[in-house]
Amino acid sequence: MKRYFIHTFGCQMNVNDSLRMSEVLSQMSYAPTPVPDNADLIILNTCSIREKAEDKMLSALGRYKPVKASRGALIGVGGCVAQQEKDKLLKKVPYLDFVFGPDNIARLPDIIGRVSAERERVVETAFVNSEEYVFPRADPETSRGKVTEFVTVMKGCDNVCSFCIVPHTRGREVSRAFPDVLVEVADLAKVGVREVTLIGQNVNSYAGGISFAQLLLRTAEVPGIERVRFTTSHPHDLSDELIEAFRVQPKITPHFHLPVQCGSDRILKMMRRDYTVVQYLERLAKLREARPGIAVTTDIIVGFPGETEEEFEMTMQLTEQVRYDNQFSFVYSPRPKTGAALREKDWGPVPHEVKIARLERLQKLQRRISGEITAALVGSEVEVMVEGHSRYDATKRFGRTPENRTVNFDGDAPAGSFVTVKVERATPNQLAGKQVALLKPPTVEPLPVPMAEAPFHVVAEA
């Protein structure tokens, strides 16, 4: 049997796409391998949100070149870099066999067949017409024994933020019909999945026959589902209806990832974000009033063209004011075809060393805030959904709180259980403690394997 290895870069959408790739390959009688040197097929599922991710991809391709020389392995590149660069990648990497975009995962059998039979180098990056697009869905049998799963509800983005390449690599917004979403969720619940994460580039603008708030509420009503998460959201589309859903349905987890990007109204306007800092804070205040204790995380870009020291300080002040539970912060990276990249010289590029210094200051501030938030939980008891053995110590269990905080703990509850854990230690990014009570057993017999890791054939990195 031929074996495959998938190397994933970037966001949860890419992780989900890689899982769908693995299902397609399994149907082709490929088996996964955790060792790329043993693979007959290597796929890099790429991210182009930052230049650094592209550099990592090219570095990884270089590492996999000897596998092609020794085993004759096929090497393909999928994801957003593939969509962006198309046939340029074949010219840049002579040993690359095929390139395919996010819309073309279902065509992998044809692509691989053409490469194998005809030794043809293939590029498939056409966006599928919205009426013809078939959303990837998890195979319930593949998901059997898992306790958490992604469910795609939409793709693409109609916002044109000046820093973002996603509209060019993922296309226009297309929403999945809500009955199809609910059928997939129900199928997953029947095989033991207890938490689903509804994903899309901008889920708040979902338009699959009902509003996104209504979709969340209906998903929470599916028998067997205990937790409903989602990502990613745009502050401009955070509606009162969605906030009310957090108030009335406890299964919608108290965690909201709400990317602010920066703390300056002038920069937000240049970014084309369509909200001000005051408007963002007003939405956030309503959310916290509706769901006290909700964990809020964010994305921040440092060193956007034209950002002054005073404007960076506004971002620092906003971080201190909001007290995010965590944040994903990066230096600005110009992306092809984006408005900011085209106007960077006019707006004034921020020197690299200034970007790095600002990022280090911001991340230091966030580590302090995150540490204060988690330290306050020491001595308390938290609810944890057990996902399996800890990746750090196989004698311990691993899971997450409703607020999406990682917990490693002493206990014996199987994956899929809900337990109470007394928090004994905390770092800015995780909690540790011991199990003190079993709240709910799993709904199906758990698999006798660790669940804390991603599937071993999908190696993910940012």
UniProtKB/Swiss-Prot annotation:
It catalyses: N(6)-dimethylallyladenosine(37) in tRNA + (sulfur carrier)-SH + AH2 + 2 S-adenosyl-L-methionine = 2-methylsulfanyl-N(6)-dimethylallyladenosine(37) in tRNA + (sulfur carrier)-H + 5'-deoxyadenosine + L-methionine + A + S-adenosyl-L-homocysteine + 2 H(+). One of its GO terms (cellular component) is cytosol. Residues 143-372 form the Radical SAM core domain. [4Fe-4S] cluster 2 binds at residues 157, 161, 164. It is found in: Cytoplasm. Belongs to the methylthiotransferase family. MiaB subfamily. Monomer. Catalyzes the methylthiolation of N6-(dimethylallyl)adenosine (i(6)A), leading to the formation of 2-methylthio-N6-(dimethylallyl)adenosine (ms(2)i(6)A) at position 37 in tRNAs that read codons beginning with uridine. This is tRNA-2-methylthio-N(6)-dimethylallyladenosine synthase.
